Amino acid sequence: MSKKTVKISIAGSAGRMGKMLVNVVDQHVECELVAATCHPSEEGVIGKDAGLISGINKNNIFISDNPKELLKGEVIIDFTTPESTVHNSNLAAENKIGLVIGTTGLSKEQENIIEKNSQLSPIIYSSNMSVGVNLLFSLIDKAVRSIDNNWDIEVLEMHHRHKVDAPSGTALSMGKVAAASREHQFEKIKKLSREGKVGQRSNEEIGFATLRGGSVVGDHTMILAHEDERIELTHKATNRKIYANGAVKAAIWCSNKQKGLFSMKQVLGL
């Protein structure tokens, strides 16, 4: 028996991640692209063939600025902006279709809307769709549970000069995993920046350092520092195709769910 072909809609199809997603879906045997949208301000791509815009052969899927076109799919993949993502999650919930969210920089209020909408439709929300990064999260959990509070935890991340949010969603997720492993409240112990005479760090504190420059796809390191030794857990992305591959894998998994809020950890069975 042949496998089901999942109908995929891509929001933000003219962006860097959107183009990569069009490429990955085109090559995948278990899904097909049925709709592609962009922001109304992207006038240069509206009505253009999504395949040609993405650097592949013509696929006869024409980019629209109407979000309702996304409803042609069984699952929407969304790497856009927080505002567009919330709108698309409302649309998915109203029509009970799946949604995979790779957008970062959502506020707590926006995340609450996503969570509420997951009561009506299946939503996969992850700060990073990469298999490797999600394995890193598992390694962080295991490592932090194995050490005591005398080890200091710091997170270092670097991305390309065009990234607009800082620290990255992945870096924050790393901190949240570590905090949960120590049974601490992340919001109370995070230190997103340091400047001037800030005093000695506390044992509970999780510090962040952010670098921006060049074309770096994404480097993330968690440093576990003790008096006499240091552990560094690192993931380096060299091609954003890893995020697209993960997102498509998540969309196929999502197509078999009725409702609920899930993460890549569940998709990958970690």
Locate the predicted segments by residue.
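C-terminal substrate-binding/catalytic lobe of Rossmann-fold NAD(P)-dependent oxidoreductases
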Residues: S9-A11, R16-P67, N149-L270
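A short, aliphatic-rich alpha-helical micro-motif
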Residues: E69-L71
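Short, ordered loop/turn segments at secondary-structure junctions
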Residues: H39, T104-L106, N128-M129, M158-H160
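Rossmann-like NAD(P)H-binding beta-loop-alpha module
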Residues: N134-N150, A166
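N-terminal Rossmann-like NAD(P) cofactor-binding module of classical short-chain dehydrogenase/reductase
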Residues: I76-I77
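Rossmann-fold NAD(P)-binding glycine/threonine-rich loop
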Residues: V86-E94, G102-I123, N134
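Extreme N-terminal starter segment of soluble prokaryotic enzymes
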Residues: K3-I8
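Rossmann-fold dehydrogenase core element
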Residues: G98, I113-S130, D148-I153
